């Protein structure tokens, strides 16, 4: 018995059979059983890209500690100076992921050091505000800025400088308060406060009136949406479209130009419900919740609002516009919110209720109001409600893969329309709705990097049986889901090679299955642009990672690729606004949104190139100036075309203008040097007050602490903060002396011409005219530092400046007396901006 126990406890020698791992599907095969392509890739249609690499797990078993040492050497250098003061490796020890087939697989530790990218080098960014707690998705603007040291420094400099200036000038103006606007908007009303209508400066007065009208409009948006509904019937008495207007005009427009963007209705059934609703409304002027009239009413209101957007942004004459002008539709969304979210409707769900939620999701995306918010995440909770409602009703992958398994039992009022809607019709509606919900879930992943809420995907061939454009796109879903898993399963170690490969597969298949019908051109345009936007954000994440791991060759390839993508997308926006229009103009309200998302990303990423340009020895002031002018052209295009109508576009213009003025420096003023020295100077000032732990700069840029300590060891006459940054903080900075970035100057030319020089340019107008006029009051204040407005005006630069005059006595950025740090930094700001540049933002 003892012998048997010893034998049982002894290690059994097993045959060593090395395995290989398919890089597509991660299927692991033994050497004698290997088949190329593997069965998974044959099923998924990825035969051409199937190849194997040896599983590092086998190498470990064969070589023991030697392999461990080699793997450790391959791991990227640890990134120090996180917000929590600790250091963490980019590559984790071991992880497990779930493949699309549901198998649990061991992910190889590392294929090579540069294959893995850390999307959250500072950790996941969670913002706590009174109104909301938000964890930002990996590709939203806030996360991009948080990941990039240069953009983080720019944002930190901007916020500190704005705060200093507003504190100095606070009390110089009686702010007019609009309670409907958020806190960040209130001081913007400084432009509304004063001004003589008969002033000789008519241009300034024009700016004031335009700014005020925009503030009032956006304030009304928020006020109308938040209004408390007491009597719906009274609100709708004269403002509900008549039966003839809705059925003969609005619904016809919806079927002709909008329905393919929201293919979730069986139109004959909808018309039946609408006619029943109007029969009751015209007779009693009441809306019965018990009979679900309020659901049909919400559909009518949403379709009307969407058709208003369609006709408004088409910029074409339409008789519908005349009818819409007679209706007060401002309270429609508040009424819908009242019926959907204040009456416990979310405890159960009907088909009509689900369609309302989907229409509301579509409206929030397209509407010029707040909509999806600054980070495009405000509808994420609504999307979760939609998906939960789908699951409750049986709308899932099953209705597409095996629709024959469903049978429908109709009760009550549902039995009254069997001649209109049969069980087979219900199956078709289910399939269209699920395809549409899938599309939205995957689209927001591509735009924002946020994790898909629907965690399953299946290979699905719809050839010859497409019910809608969205149903056709389900063929792409399994690839998009692979991309989601690679990105979100382990954000700190994303396999960039595998992700790019799946992106290429998605683009290739999309080109094969895209519908060429004219009514679907705008849907193809949006999806193609969404894929390009995903690649843009991924390339920027790779760029910041390569800087940290000091991979010079890959960095040079990536930085050129990223710039080419920026230029390509900017040119696409330019053609969209100024080129020939091939798409249905009534779909422009829909495509405007993806273009605004792209333009906003461009306005965020171009400054990152301007700040890095000092590292490229072959690039000088002329190239930097061209980049700044390119930034000005993109901003002018974006804000003039969309800023008058879209709330979030208008709001982002203030920070974009400040960033532009920071970067638009004369030849002898390097903007990166100014930012770096300013932040170091602020750090020194706060260090004297012993408030390091509470300082924003320490939280955002902890690397500056070690940089300051290194600078203190260098004699003053050898002090060069930029050079030390390029060698210590970003060591790759001194390895690009001979690198030349191809700016694609021929593609930049359309942006170097100010198309709005003869008209009103809203991007130019902010600060440049208003601030110089409003600054007159600042002369009479008792602030700690008095501003000389005339000198500031003389030193202020023209927009898109080309030949700046060097300053004879440049300001010393490193003060000798710590007591004067506050005054010195304010003087620095005065030399860069007009006195009230900043007060308009906070």
UniProtKB/Swiss-Prot annotation:
Coarse class of the protein's main subcellular location: cytoplasm
Gene3D superfamilies xref list: Zn(2)-C6 fungal-type DNA-binding domain (4.10.240.10)
GO molecular function term, any single one: DNA-binding transcription factor activity, RNA polymerase II-specific
Family annotation (SUPFAM superfamilies): Zn2/Cys6 DNA-binding domain
CDD domains: GAL4
Biased segments, Low complexity type: 87-99
Keyword entries, A-Z: Cytoplasm, DNA-binding, Metal-binding, Mitochondrion, Nucleus, Repressor, Transcription, Transcription regulation, Zinc
GO CC term (a single one): mitochondrion
Compartment(s) where it occurs, according to its Swiss-Prot or TrEMBL record: Cytoplasm; Nucleus; Mitochondrion
Region (Disordered): 55-101
Gene Ontology biological process terms from the UniProt entry: positive regulation of transcription by RNA polymerase II
Family statement: Belongs to the OAF3 family.
Protein purpose: Transcriptional inhibitor with a significantly increased number of target genes in response to oleate.
Full protein name: Oleate activated transcription factor 3
Species this protein is from: Zygosaccharomyces rouxii (strain ATCC 2623 / CBS 732 / NBRC 1130 / NCYC 568 / NRRL Y-229)
